């Protein structure tokens, strides 16, 4: 039994050495020296200034700044699964314009109201801080917004009977306009500033350390689990709250 285990261990060691040798042979030394790869227990990450060319681990520059327009029919839901600065404005005509480094802009896809970066089918990830991509969107009837990650979304001229906003991660959202009711869900450390949104009824759920600011005039239902904060511009006539953890419900008045 011991002999078998020793044989397996020796074979694993040989395989590991061969794998590292292969990586170094195809340019791994230069990549490590230049800081283009980070080794971790779960993944390798490319330096944010480069992109993977899909051949053998070498990197290429993300390219010049360009603009690109996407075709969109303007559904009632917008889901953001990438890191970017996004400006949304309610308007009669739907349009999407993306600007940033060519290597990033060319990867942006919009399918069924979902913004994301294309999967290139490699174990390498092009890392960026979200400031590289700027996306301007207009559409007539979006009523649901979902942010996954650390995107920043600013919504202007919102005018719909209701609003549903969810943030998963550390995203930031600011919405200005008017609606009758709003449902806000934050999971993580995201921030939602809805003080510029005129509304009557609000339902707020914060799980984690997120922060929400609203100004409902008639009623509010607030649930906090964790260390999150919810600030209401004033105490509405009807208010219910459930707080578990160190979170706070505050009033500005």
Short names for language-model regions:
Residues 70, 78, 96-98, 117, ...:
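Preference for bulky hydrophobic residues occupying beta-strand positions
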Residues 2-148, 156-159, 176, 197, ...:
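Acidic (Asp/Glu) and glycine-rich low-complexity loops/linkers
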Residues 173-253:
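Short, surface-exposed interaction patches in beta-rich subdomains
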Residues 68-69, 106, 135, 153-154, ...:
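Short, flexible, glycine/charge-rich loop motifs used to bind or transfer phosphoryl groups or to couple energy/partner
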Residues 2-3, 79-80, 86, 162-168, ...:
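Terminal or extended low-complexity segments
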Residues 64-65, 150, 170, 209, ...:
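Short, recurring structural edge motifs at helix starts
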Residues 146-193:
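Right-handed parallel beta-helix
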């Amino acid at each position: 039994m011991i002999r078998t285990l020793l044989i397996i261990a020796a074979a694993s060691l040989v395989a590991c050495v061969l794998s590292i040798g292969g990586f170094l042979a195809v340019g791994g030394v230069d990549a490590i020296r230049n800081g283009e790869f980070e080794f971790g227990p779960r993944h390798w990450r490319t330096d944010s200034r480069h992109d993977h060319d899909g051949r053998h681990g070498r990197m290429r520059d993300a390219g010049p700044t360009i603009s690109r327009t996407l075709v969109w029919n303007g559904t009632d839901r917008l889901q953001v699964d990438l890191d970017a600065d996004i400006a949304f404005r309610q308007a009669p005509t739907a349009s999407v314009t993306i600007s940033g480094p060519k290597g990033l802009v060319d990867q942006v896809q919009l399918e069924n109201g979902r913004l994301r970066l294309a999967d290139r089918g490699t174990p390498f990830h092009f890392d960026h801080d979200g400031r590289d991509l700027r996306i301007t969107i207009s559409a007539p009837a979006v009523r649901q917004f979902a942010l996954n990650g650390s995107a920043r979304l600013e919504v202007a001229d919102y005018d719909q009977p209701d609003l549903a906003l969810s943030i998963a991660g550390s995203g930031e959202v600011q919405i200005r306009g008017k609606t009758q009711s709003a449902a806000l869900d934050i999971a993580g450390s995201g921030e939602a500033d809805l003080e510029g949104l005129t509304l009557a009824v609000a339902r707020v759920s914060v799980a984690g350390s997120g922060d929400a600011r609203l100004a409902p005039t008639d009623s509010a239902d607030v649930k906090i689990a964790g260390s999150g904060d919810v600030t209401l511009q004033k105490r509405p006539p009807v208010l219910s709250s459930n707080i578990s953890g160190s979170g706070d419900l505050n009033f500005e008045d």
